[in-house]
Amino acid sequence: SHPFPFISNSIMPNTYIIRMADVSDAFGSHGLNTKFDENIEANIQNFIKSLMNIYSVDKENVVICGASSGGTGAVYHGLIGGYKTFAIDPFLGNHNYYGGKDPLYLHSIRTPIGEIFKKLPNEIDHNLENQVVISSAKVSEFYPDIKELKKALPTITLCEFDFEKIQKHIDFSGNTVF
């Protein structure tokens, strides 16, 4: 049995899905600006707005989704763009997860992710609704940072997920369908 229903069976007709993923030009950026490209954030926001325009989608009907590093981008872009967000165990800057062996790409991000998310609550509209983050205090190495963001932005809904197949952060993405 799978903890999540398959999204294709659960969405309404005329629904368009853009999943935040950390690939291509943005590899390793978590959807954030890097030292090599300071336009990633603006490009993503413009891409979302462009698709909304092409498909005549109202802002209140947009949900930004992602897991892990894609969840980082989903939370960030959902908050700065004022979109609904559904993020699963996003990385918000806890380098302890890497045990002192930070991947090189984390050093290419223009501003450290932890700093970005500490400043973010002072830079956005706090009246946002439908900001949902799924994590687990039992298994997620990222949970303390997620809890800090929730403290700074109380409108974020933090869903504490408990499923026997999820024993560590890496298990979230493998047990997620969206």
Residue ranges and their predicted role:
Residues 1-27:
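Short, surface-exposed "cap/lid" segments of acyl-processing enzymes
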Residues 21, 65, 88-89:
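Alpha/beta-hydrolase-fold catalytic nucleophile elbow
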Residues 33-55:
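Alpha/beta-hydrolase active-site loop
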Residues 57-68:
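Alpha/beta-hydrolase fold nucleophile elbow
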Residues 66-78:
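Glycine-rich nucleophile elbow surrounding the catalytic serine of serine-hydrolase chemistry
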Residues 79-86:
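Conserved hydrolase catalytic core segment
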Residues 87-97:
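Active-site nucleophile loop of the alpha/beta-hydrolase fold
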Residues 96-170, 175:
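The feature captures the conserved acid-bearing segment of alpha/beta-hydrolase catalytic domains
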